[in-house]
């Protein structure tokens, strides 16, 4: 019987594919961690706590670092999905984990579809219901396509970079008190543990933890020989997430510090949208729509 030739792990094509999968995993984790829920929470907590919320951002990044490093290393070294690892450790627990992640993913993605609808509404004025339907159909088409793998990798990277650049633009437009924000990051006037728990639960828990690591499994970047590359990618991913979170916080802080009162309690409240619009006018609203979508 003919045997398959072993993969040359020093060939330029293998190295290029591995680098591509690592970069895609980085941005998949980053974009998953900064969805409609986090954007809305950041706007709400910044409006109520001001610069002191910077400490909550820092705490979420530190916790994120510990969790993501552990999960990425274990999953890629064992070459097993999280539910399979859990079943090996405690028989039956993997099924419970899978059910919890599926349920959490369903709840969060209902929010993501709603956020996509609101994003298209802010970006082009489309009715949020139709925006959600069109976004869901587009997602189904992309993920059901046989040729979607490489397209998804490229799309994730491009959209992640666009998200950072657009938020940077709004941040500079809002002119936040950066010095005060940096001070409050390490020496906050107030520490709200409920706020920190909410932010951490929405950005570290659930399927977000496993998105990047499972993407590496799909691309074959596994084994002890890849541990250094995986650890480096996890660190870079956390840095990208942290950068994006802090830029978003500063963009909204600039608006709040200027004296603008954001509506965070009414039925139609959309504090993040208000902040972007106050910072950069109609352009800011369109940018918010694109980021949310």
What are these regions (language model features)?
Residues 29, 56-89, 96-104:
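Juxtamembrane transmembrane-helix boundary signature
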Residues 16-21, 50-53, 88-95, 124-131, ...:
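Membrane-interfacial loop-to-helix junctions in multi-pass transporters
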Residues 77, 94-125, 132-136:
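Hydrophobic transmembrane alpha-helices that form the core helical bundles
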Residues 20-37, 170-256:
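Hydrophobic, membrane-embedded alpha-helices of multi-pass small-molecule transporters
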Residues 21-63, 69-70, 266-273:
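Transmembrane helix-boundary motif of multi-pass solute transporters/channels
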Residues 79-93, 247-293:
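TM-loop-TM module centered on a large, flexible mid-protein loop between adjacent transmembrane helices
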Residues 25-29, 57, 61, 95-106, ...:
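Hydrophobic alpha-helical transmembrane segments of multi-pass small-molecule transporters/permeases
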Residues 26, 98-99, 122-145, 159-171:
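Transmembrane alpha-helical segments of multi-pass small-molecule transport proteins
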């Amino acid at each position: 019987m003919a045997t398959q030739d072993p993969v040359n792990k020093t060939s330029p094509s293998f190295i290029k594919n591995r680098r591509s999968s690592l970069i895609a995993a980085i941005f998949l984790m980053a974009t998953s961690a900064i969805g409609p829920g986090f954007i809305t929470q950041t706007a709400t907590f910044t409006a109520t706590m001001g610069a002191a919320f910077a400490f909550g951002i820092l705490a979420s990044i530190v916790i994120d670092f510990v969790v993501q490093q552990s999960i990425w290393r274990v999953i890629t070294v064992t070459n097993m999905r999280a539910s399979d690892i859990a079943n090996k450790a405690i028989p039956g627990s993997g099924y419970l984990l899978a059910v919890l992640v599926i349920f959490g993913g369903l709840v969060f993605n209902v929010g993501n579809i709603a956020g996509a609808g609101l994003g298209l509404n802010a970006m082009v004025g489309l009715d949020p219901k139709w925006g959600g339907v069109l976004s869901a159909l587009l997602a189904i088409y992309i993920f059901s396509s046989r040729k979607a793998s490489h397209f998804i990798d490229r799309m994730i990277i491009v959209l992640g970079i666009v998200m950072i650049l657009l938020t940077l633009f709004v941040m500079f437009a809002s002119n936040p008190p950066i010095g005060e924000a940096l001070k409050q990051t390490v020496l906050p006037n107030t520490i709200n543990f409920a706020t920190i728990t909410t932010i951490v639960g929405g950005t570290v828990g659930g399927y977000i933890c496993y998105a990047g690591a499972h993407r590496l499994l799909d691309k074959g970047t596994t084994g002890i020989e890849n541990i250094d590359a995986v650890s480096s990618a996890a660190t870079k991913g956390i840095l990208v997430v942290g950068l994006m979170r802090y830029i978003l916080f500063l963009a909204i802080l600039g608006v709040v510090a200027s004296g603008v009162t954001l509506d965070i309690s009414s039925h139609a409240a959309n504090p993040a949208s208000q902040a972007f619009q106050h910072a950069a006018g109609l352009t800011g609203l369109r940018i918010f729509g694109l980021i949310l979508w």
